[in-house]
């Protein structure tokens, strides 16, 4: 029996959106993505205790300063979890920069270089890592610098066409346009509470971005993220990559309904437009209330979970 997950793999690179090693072993994705929230939930799993202990020992060996130890411990823990995942996935791990640096280009660049150095020291080459950065103007500028250094980036918390366009123009390796969080916003801010997959505003957003990239010949990979239901995933079959949580991977694996490719650009490739200026980026992005609210909220939520992780690590330092 061919499952929907099997069919999806034939047209889209399937990525696991989790830090749970057991789930990754079960569904055998090509890549895996983590974020501060997933690192926090993974850290509560008993099999991760040795990784936390090792990160604490590493941090204590680096510095006698408690504040610095905390920074080093959280960076090392994120990398330790990534290293475990890389033992299973054949492709790449996405490890996220501290969300509190989202509006600081230089600090983002420095944090990314540090994470890469930790992976490199463990014998992992750059081509197996994506550095995840929020799609702020400052984050996109940081990614532009990093890409030129051979450090590939995954630009996340992407909700607007302006963000997508600026990422492509910066030569970013991959973007993660969010689907489910867009749907959440429309449900909360309109009278319409139910959406068929094809009319789901998150699905429409990713479809537009995918077609725009293909129409203008951008090489940036489109990886749909943040799904609320299987319908959103099947409606984006054919997208370059999709990063999917274990619960939805399970649903796809248990369903054998035929899957039809939905995304495939067959038109001609046009000349690229002039890159957006900073002023144009902010005008276009800020014209989309959903994108403004969801980007800010996403950064806040990741920062809260980063702080919870710090509280847990502080108790051990």
UniProtKB/Swiss-Prot annotation:
A GO molecular-function descriptor = transaldolase activity
Give the matching PROSITE patterns.
TRANSALDOLASE_1, TRANSALDOLASE_2
- The superkingdom listed in its UniProt entry is Bacteria
Which keywords does this chain's UniProt record carry? Cytoplasm, Pentose shunt, Schiff base, Transferase
Under the cellular component aspect of Gene Ontology, which terms does the record hold? cytosol
The kind of enzyme this is, by top-level EC class, is transferase
So, what pathway does this thing act in? Carbohydrate degradation; pentose phosphate pathway; D-glyceraldehyde 3-phosphate and beta-D-fructose 6-phosphate from D-ribose 5-phosphate and D-xylulose 5-phosphate (non-oxidative stage): step 2/3
Q: What does this protein do?
A: Transaldolase is important for the balance of metabolites in the pentose-phosphate pathway.
What HAMAP family is this protein classified in? Transaldolase_1
Q: What is this protein called?
A: Transaldolase
Source organism (scientific name)? Haemophilus influenzae (strain PittGG)
């Amino acid at each position: 029996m061919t499952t929907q997950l099997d069919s999806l793999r034939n047209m889209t690179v399937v990525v696991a959106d989790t830090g749970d090693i057991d789930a990754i072993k079960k569904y055998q994705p090509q890549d895996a993505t983590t974020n501060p929230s997933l690192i926090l939930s993974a850290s509560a799993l008993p099999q991760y205790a040795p990784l936390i202990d090792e990160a604490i020992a590493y941090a204590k060996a680096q510095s006698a300063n408690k504040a610095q130890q905390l920074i080093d411990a959280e960076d090392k823990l994120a990398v330790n979890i990534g290293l475990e995942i890389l033992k299973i996935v054949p492709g790449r791990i996405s490890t996220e920069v501290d969300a509190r640096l989202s509006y600081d280009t230089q600090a983002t660049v420095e944090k990314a270089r540090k994470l890469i150095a930790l992976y490199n020291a463990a014998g992992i080459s750059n081509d197996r890592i994506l550095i995840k950065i929020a799609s702020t103007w400052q984050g996109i500028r940081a990614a532009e610098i990093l890409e030129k250094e051979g450090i590939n980036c995954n630009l996340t918390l992407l909700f607007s066409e302006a963000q997508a366009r600026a990422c492509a123009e910066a030569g970013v390796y991959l973007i993660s346009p969010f689907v489910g969080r867009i749907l959440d916003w429309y449900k909360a801010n309109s009278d319409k509470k139910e959406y068929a997959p094809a009319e789901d505003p998150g699905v429409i957003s990713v479809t537009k971005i995918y077609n725009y990239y293909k129409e203008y010949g951008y090489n940036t990979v489109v990886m749909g993220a943040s799904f609320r239901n299987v319908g959103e995933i099947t409606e984006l079959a054919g997208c370059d990559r999709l990063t999917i949580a274990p619960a939805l991977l399970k649903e796809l694996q248990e369903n054998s309904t035929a899957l039809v490719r939905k995304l495939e650009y067959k038109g001609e490739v046009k000349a690229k437009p002039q890159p957006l200026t900073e002023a144009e980026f902010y005008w276009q992005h800020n014209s989309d209330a959903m994108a403004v609210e969801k980007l800010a909220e996403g950064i806040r939520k990741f920062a809260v979970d980063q702080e919870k992780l710090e509280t847990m690590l502080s108790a051990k330092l």
